[in-house]
Swiss-Prot record:
CDD domains: FMT_core_Met-tRNA-FMT_N, Met_tRNA_FMT_C. Keywords: Protein biosynthesis, Transferase. Signal peptide: none annotated. Its EC number is 2.1.2.9. The keyword Transferase applies. SUPFAM superfamilies: FMT C-terminal domain-like, Formyltransferase. The gene is fmt. One of its GO terms (cellular component) is cytosol. (6S)-5,6,7,8-tetrahydrofolate binds at S110, N111, L112, P113. This is Methionyl-tRNA formyltransferase. Belongs to the Fmt family. It catalyses: L-methionyl-tRNA(fMet) + (6R)-10-formyltetrahydrofolate = N-formyl-L-methionyl-tRNA(fMet) + (6S)-5,6,7,8-tetrahydrofolate + H(+). It is an enzyme of class 2 (transferase). InterPro entries: Fmt (IPR005794), Formyl_trans_C (IPR005793), Formyl_trans_C_sf (IPR037022), Formyl_transf_N (IPR002376), Formyl_transf_N_sf (IPR036477), Formyl_transferase-like_C_sf (IPR011034), Met-tRNA-FMT_C (IPR044135), Met-tRNA-FMT_N (IPR041711). It comes from Bifidobacterium longum (strain NCC 2705).
Amino acid sequence: MLKLVFAGTPDVAVPSLKAFAADPRFDVVGVITRPDAPTGRGRKLTPSPVKATALELGLPVIDLKPRSPEFMEALNNLHADIAAVIAYGNILPKNVLDAVPMGWYNLHFSNLPKWRGAAPAQRAIWAGDPTTGADVFKVGEGLDDGPIVASLTIELTGRETSGELLDRLAEEGAPMYVDALAAVGEGTATFTAQPAEGLEYAHKITVEDARISWTDEAEAIDRQVRACTPHPGAWTELFAEGPIADNDEPAAKPLTLHILAAQPADQSNPNTPAELQPGELKVGKKNVWVGTGSTPLELTQVKAQGKKAMRAADWARGARLSPAACVR
């Protein structure tokens, strides 16, 4: 039985933790995660999903900073043979990597070397990739550049959000992850160097990145919305009274409008506007459309500043928008 230490923090790491804990080939001797963080309106300290799961499973938890002497002492006391790390949220220094004899192995949500970095699933959706996947690779000091031990590939539907894609990859990747590390322990694993071609970086998506430019084409905005859902959330500024006609300046202070779901407008629907200017709003009885750099985009779910998430048509009726209302 391999003694395994597991490092992870968010929900996407939980299926893998549960899979290792349930597999008789492994003894999960410890779980490393980030410290409790303030959440919600009350800013109450809350354990990470991985810590909460570890405590439910009766597993010892280390939630110290990885560069502290106390962390190294706690890690060494586990006497782990092998380590799994998935979405931990901290860079592991060399002394930590060297402390586990068989090494550290990461489950990464792309087919490497494409989309190395922090947001692989999000970037795959935003780019309109037809496929993506998950790889298990040995962690080194470089960024996601270690040899691959196992890999799976899936087709994208073209309608999933990044949250849905991550959930799917987390579930489908977990059994592969467990089998890959078992093979490493048994000495039967194959280590394949990453190809030299096809390298792209999946930089973290910032709040400013998530702001919609309505001069982009409808299909591109649709991908942006899905890539940014649920985090950080695609958004725009709503000018409910519209611009002033003589100088095109907004008539009132704008409000933030989060776009939770949208899709390129159905051009076969007779109610769909034939043409709208970028950012121009058109409200129908059951639909809300926005002009883009190509065809209109239909908004299906939104969250206005200070309001709850709701169907776009319901929001528009309650907002009592001026006919000149626009988004920018």
